[in-house]
């Protein structure tokens, strides 16, 4: 026993610096081992990789939930929807029963009508053979009324009172002729008009002519 203790002492020399032994003891502490065990989740080390469900699986789950309305909480909206569906189904069944009663005779048999052996009078007339009546629109009627009004209005002739008075007509023509003879000299443009305009050059004349044309 003494020999073994001496052997252990001789094999494990004391470290006066205290750095190496403290580092080895710190690595094998129980607290660190417990922390490492806590990080292991279901046999997978941290960080964990989460396996997400595919989109099709989610849709299947949602459809199953919608198809099973027993476990769905009954809200006001859901209750109103159920009531409306029940009433619509009841109305549909009553309509079907009424149609069945109306289409059957007293013996309960249905009456079938053959469309192929209808009389000629009951068959519809083709559109090409139908007699189309002319449709007069309101605009056409208004145009006809306006034209009639224009034709009915007489045109006033202001020269009818002087038709048999040759002197009045002659004096009127002579006055016009004398007036235009007096004004003719003032209205005519002098032939050297452009030569007298010193501010207008040849280029400006060309531009002016192009604009006038």
Swiss-Prot record:
Taxonomy, superkingdom: Eukaryota
Biological process (GO), any one: cell division
Record-linked Pfam families: Cyclin_N
Positions of the UniProt region annotated as Disordered: 1-23
Tissues expressed in: Only expressed in organs with dividing cells.
UniProt keyword annotation of Oxidoreductase present: no
Claim: Isomerase is one of the keywords in the record: no
Keyword annotations from UniProtKB, A to Z: Cell cycle, Cell division, Cyclin, Mitosis
Transmembrane segments: none
SUPFAM superfamilies: Cyclin-like
InterPro entries xrefs: Cyclin-like_sf, Cyclin_N
Assembly with partners or alone: Interacts with the CDC2 protein kinase to form a serine/threonine kinase holoenzyme complex also known as maturation promoting factor (MPF). The cyclin subunit imparts substrate specificity to the complex.
Record-stated family: Belongs to the cyclin family. Cyclin AB subfamily.
Role noted for this protein: Essential for the control of the cell cycle at the G2/M (mitosis) transition.
Protein name: G2/mitotic-specific cyclin-1
